[in-house]
Amino acid sequence: MNPFNIISDTGVSAAVYAGLSRAKCTGQYKECRNGGSTFLRNVKFHITDPRNRNLTLNGRKSNIFQMVAETFWVMSGSGNIKEFLEFFLPRAPQYSDDGINWHGAYGPRMYAHNQLQSAIDLLIKDKDTRRAYVMIADPTLDSAPAIEAAYGVGHSPKDVPCNREIHINIIEDKLCMKVIQRSGDMLFGTGSINPFEFTFLQELLSEATGYALGDYQWDVTDAHYYKAFEDQVNDVLRSEQTFWPNDGKPLGTRFTSATKMQEFFAGVVRVWVKQINRLIDLGDAHYAINDLFADYGVLPEGRLRDYAKMVTFYIAAKQGEIEGDFKALLTNIPTNTDLGQAILTSPFRKFGVVLGD
């Protein structure tokens, strides 16, 4: 078995497809706590366009609306799954040790100890620094004594962070980022939400520091898929694939601090919680989020606004507030892009989507 695997491509979809293909051809099978899995050792995934993050793989059941919502939740710094996250991910409580929080939620850990702000400050001060990093792993939370103290003797945690640390460097005046991952599911983690949320973070840091966006890589010690989901892997590999490009549209932020960044995303999530609880309707949510964009200097025509609009409409549609073709939804997103195709192929079918040309 090859002890090292390097997979490099333009975007997430192409890289994930290549990873699944290689695992299917050369991966090793083993039994583990979640059933049998086929895995590759020491996989270095690398993409040259982090904006090409929107997953579009035929045969793969993926909901772009859920990915966007979870990423906003991560960036809000929350670990609480009630009210908001479980609306999008009904299975979220299955991974909670107390039924309320995810023990390994990335948001609280990334913002802890002022890590993100420290990284931003270092990068602005010295573009040659090698000290810009963010730790997700935390022995004070994840060691056996810490787990026992938090949840009781003999407790086996349901959620220990797979992603452990983030390295950020400036290479040729571009902000490049690498994430170290101990273990990654190529269908539901390392091949799905993880590259989406971390390239999203990378772009936020790029805009906060003023550097152009560089490449992204994620290094996975054990990249695998489970036997229970092998049919879905086979469906992906048998299907004809088009790896759609990204249109290059930036998020459109320039947060002056990590605190402002967290405040903004927490504010947007609070609006959505009100919408989910039917305290406000679609129109009120739309205008409240517009106000937040204005207050924090986020461009109303940037990709972040497209993402926010998607979630706002998704909530309204799930609650039956809108039906049929909704022509106002993201008319500036071409169908021949990764995001346009991610929306069109989403399994969520409660409303039609009409995009731009």
UniProtKB/Swiss-Prot annotation:
The keyword Methyltransferase applies. Its EC number is 2.1.2.-. The keyword Lyase does not apply. Induction: Hydroxymethylase appears immediately after infection. InterPro entries: Thymidate_synth/dCMP_Mease_dom, Thymidate_synth/dCMP_Mease_sf. Signal peptide: none annotated. Disulfide bonds: none annotated. GO terms for molecular function: methyltransferase activity. Keywords: Host-virus interaction, Inhibition of host innate immune response by virus, Methyltransferase, Restriction-modification system evasion by virus, Transferase, Viral immunoevasion. One of its GO terms (biological process) is methylation. It comes from the Viruses. Pfam families: Thymidylat_synt (PF00303). Coiled coil: none annotated. Belongs to the thymidylate synthase family. Catalyzes formation of 5-hydroxymethyldeoxyuridylate (5HMdUMP) as a step in the pathway that replaces dTMP by thymidine hypermodifications in the viral genome. As a final result of the pathway of hypermodification, 5-Nalpha-putrescinylthymidine (Nalpha-PutT) substitutes for about 50% of thymidines in the viral DNA. These modifications probably prevent degradation of viral genome by the host restriction-modification antiviral defense system. This is Deoxyuridylate hydroxymethyltransferase. It comes from Delftia phage PhiW-14 (Deftia acidovorans bacteriophage phiW-14).
